[in-house]
């Protein structure tokens, strides 16, 4: 089984992939990097985002909010 990291944009249904990995652990590490980059783009302080990234790594997904509404999902998906 392999694992992919992806982001699904809810408004357009566009999917962006961030790599394919041999283990779920590797994919979750990449998920953390992708989220950190997304937080930086949005100007979210890294210390504030760190706790959210830890939860995302445990769960394997994260819903991203902008202006109080969920705009996209980041997730690890097995295939």
Residue ranges of model-derived segments:
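Short, mixed-charge low-complexity intrinsically disordered segments
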Residues: 35-79
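Hydrophobic beta-strand residues in large extracellular and virion-surface proteins
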Residues: 5, 21, 27, 31, ...
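A short, charged, amphipathic alpha-helix used as a generic interaction element across diverse proteins
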Residues: 12-13, 22-45
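Generic structural signal for short, flexible, solvent-exposed coil/loop and linker residues
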Residues: 6-10, 24, 53
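Short aromatic-glycine-(Arg/Gly/Cys) micro-motifs in beta-strand/loop hairpins
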Residues: 1-17, 69, 77
């Amino acid at each position: 089984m392999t694992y992919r990291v992806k982001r699904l944009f809810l408004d357009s249904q566009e999917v962006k992939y961030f790599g394919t990995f041999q283990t779920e652990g590797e994919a979750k590490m990449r998920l953390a990097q992708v989220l950190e980059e997304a937080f930086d783009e949005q100007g979210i302080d890294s210390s504030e985002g760190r706790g959210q990234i830890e939860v995302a790594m445990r769960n394997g997904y994260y819903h991203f909010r902008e202006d109080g509404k969920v705009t996209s999902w980041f997730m690890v998906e097995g295939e």
